[in-house]
Amino acid sequence: MQAIKCVVVGDGAVGKTCLLISYTTNAFPGEYIPTVFDNYSANVMVDGKPVNLGLWDTAGQEDYDRLRPLSYPQTDVFLICFSLVSPASFENVRAKWYPEVRHHCPHTPILLVGTKLDLRDDKDTIERLRDKKLAPITYPQGLAMAREIGSVKYLECSALTQRGLKTVFDEAIRAVLCPPPVKKPGKKCTVF
């Protein structure tokens, strides 16, 4: 059975642990407890192939910036996560997570994952964001970011309702088993 190491990164509180717990146990966890490091393992079938999927959770908080990369060696695929209702976490994909992952693992495939899909249409959440002159991240915005960082796929999911959840991990496995041609991140040409 092929073993695949999948490391999940992203800002604190975007839902990385909930994503993993909901996927591996079919239950949504209760309160928020920041992660240091956790590993989960799941035996799954994708396209008729059995795979042992090793899932590595990481801490998004800055305090762990020096510790986190210790989980990066031998990673087969990264999930860079952001919350669809946190524009700051979305901006950090470009500012922090993509550069960090690429620095340590220049050729490892990346999937960009928008979490908390159930909250994008939630009236209270939209209202809270509007009060700060912000709005949830749209699908086209996520897709544009995925293209910019050369992500293999852009996916959205909800760990609470499990909508799109299985697809995230199936596509992560496919990115390793049948790698697409290498995409270079979009380069911008500026003429003065």
Swiss-Prot record:
Residues annotated for lipidation of the kind S-geranylgeranyl cysteine are C189
**Record-listed GTP binding positions:** 10-17, 57-61, 115-118
Q: Does the keyword Lipoprotein apply?
A: yes
Does the keyword field hold Hydrolase?
yes
Q: Give the result of K166R, as annotated.
A: Reduced FBXL19-mediated ubiquitination and subsequent degradation
> Which Gene3D superfamilies did the record assign?
P-loop containing nucleotide triphosphate hydrolases
Glycosylation sites noted in the Swiss-Prot or TrEMBL record: Y32
Q: Which GO terms describe its cellular component?
A: cell periphery; cytoplasmic vesicle; cytoskeleton; cytosol; endomembrane system; endoplasmic reticulum membrane; extracellular exosome; filamentous actin
Q: How is its activity regulated?
A: Regulated by guanine nucleotide exchange factors (GEFs) which promote the exchange of bound GDP for free GTP, GTPase activating proteins (GAPs) which increase the GTP hydrolysis activity, and GDP dissociation inhibitors which inhibit the dissociation of the nucleotide from the GTPase. Regulated by the GEF protein DOCK7.
Query: Motif Effector region, which positions?
Result: 32-40
Q: Which residues form the propeptide?
A: 190-192
> Tissue expression, per UniProt?
Highest levels in brain, also detected in heart, placenta and pancreas.
The record lists the catalysed reaction(s) as: GTP + H2O = GDP + phosphate + H(+)
- Location within or outside the cell: Cytoplasm; Endomembrane system; Cell projection, Lamellipodium; Cytoplasm, Perinuclear region
Provide a GO biological process annotation.
Answer: regulation of postsynapse assembly
Covalent cross-link (Glycyl lysine isopeptide (Lys-Gly) (interchain with G-Cter in ubiquitin)), residues: K166
EC annotation from Swiss-Prot or TrEMBL: 3.6.5.2
UniProt modified residues of type Cysteine methyl ester? C189
Annotated family? Belongs to the small GTPase superfamily. Rho family.
Q: Which disease is it linked to?
A: Neurodevelopmental disorder with structural brain anomalies and dysmorphic facies: An autosomal dominant neurodevelopmental disorder characterized by global developmental delay, severe intellectual disability, poor language, seizures, dysmorphic features, and thin corpus callosum.
PANTHER family from the xrefs? RHO FAMILY GTPASE
Please give the subunit comment from the record: Interacts with the GEF protein DOCK7, which promotes the exchange between GDP and GTP, and therefore activates it. Interacts with C1D. Interacts (via C-terminal region) with CIB1; the interaction induces their association with the cytoskeleton upon alpha-IIb/beta3 integrin-mediated adhesion. Interacts with NRBP.
UniProt function note: Plasma membrane-associated small GTPase which cycles between an active GTP-bound and inactive GDP-bound state. In active state binds to a variety of effector proteins to regulate cellular responses, such as cell spreading and the formation of actin-based protusions including lamellipodia and membrane ruffles. Promotes cell adhesion and spreading on fibrinogen in a CIB1 and alpha-IIb/beta3 integrin-mediated manner.
Protein name as annotated: Ras-related C3 botulinum toxin substrate 3
Q: Which organism is it from?
A: Homo sapiens
